[in-house]
């Protein structure tokens, strides 16, 4: 399912081509690209739920402190290792993620059918969430920089 999300993001969203095709047409294209029907349905449902989170009349979170500390459930810790959880905390500290967008990221991560998530895959989920939440253009650009910019020179001597 994650491969389909990446395919859609790279071929439609990130390339700035408008996604104005209907679901049946998109399903046919993804099938021609070699993806399985079951995974296609899961991926489209995942994207639909992401849009629902963003378009809801109610805020995603209510009654939260901006400087609260996130305690992860056992299931979340199983899917997001220490490195991934640390990265989410880092993104909050540099204000790429707010409390609300962090929770949206965790919600979408938990809906992926992978048992664990690599840091590189988490970065893409963050990018997808930020892209779909209006008013986060600056955070999206910062996240893009974190994904695409490679450090120059040697990190260690």
From Swiss-Prot:
Gene name tied to this protein: smg
UniProt-listed PANTHER family: PROTEIN SMG (PTHR38692:SF1)
Superkingdom of origin: Bacteria
One Pfam match: DUF494
Protein name listed in UniProt: Protein Smg homolog
Family recorded in the similarity comment: Belongs to the Smg family.
Naturally occurring in which organism (per UniProt): Shewanella frigidimarina (strain NCIMB 400)
Signal peptide: none
InterPro entries: Smg (IPR007456)
């Amino acid at each position: 399912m994650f491969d389909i999300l990446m395919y859609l993001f790279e071929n439609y969203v990130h390339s700035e081509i408008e996604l104005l095709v209907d679901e049946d047409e998109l399903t046919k294209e993804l099938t021609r690209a070699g993806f399985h029907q079951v995974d296609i349905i899961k991926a489209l449902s995942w994207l639909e739920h992401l849009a629902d989170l963003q378009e809801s009349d109610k805020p995603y979170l209510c009654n939260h402190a901006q400087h609260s500390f996130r305690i992860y459930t056992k299931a979340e810790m199983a899917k997001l290792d220490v490195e991934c959880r640390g990265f989410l905390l880092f993104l909050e500290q540099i204000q790429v993620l707010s409390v609300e967008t962090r929770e949206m990221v965790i919600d979408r991560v938990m809906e992926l059918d992978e048992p664990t998530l690599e840091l590189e895959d988490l970065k893409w989920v963050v990018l997808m969430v930020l892209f779909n939440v209006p008013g986060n253009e600056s955070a999206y650009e910062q996240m893009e920089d974190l994904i695409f910019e490679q450090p120059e020179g040697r990190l260690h001597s």
